């Protein structure tokens, strides 16, 4: 299994969005890769060795709506895509073709959607007060997605080297 074979089975709406993301260059200090498409490919390839289809498809879909939400940050001139996590969640939960693809690939639709929804909040855990952070982590544990988010969050960080055996090293935040 590789990224290309996974996306070749995706519905046309996903293929179109992926193609369009080849033209979106993100903030280079967080995303040194050439485009959002390449970022998605890297994240997905990092997740394939887990053999967890929930994670693998979340890798494909987590940034799928970045172009839909993009705007220029007036402070630094870099593109930003606020709300792309919510937009991806909505796209997944409201599009039968995507739902059928996820299920057909052997993944859990609800888990994939919630990993996509939580992926930005995961990166912000280090900015939260300890009580709020631990409550959020417990909520994700209750949803059955904490372990997957911990892996996805490490795979999604382009600044640190990804190490499946040492996830916290790759997180954008450090546990106190």
What are these regions (language model features)?
Residues 161-162, 166-175:
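Long, amphipathic alpha-helical surface segments
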Residues 1, 175-176:
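Short intrinsically disordered terminal tails
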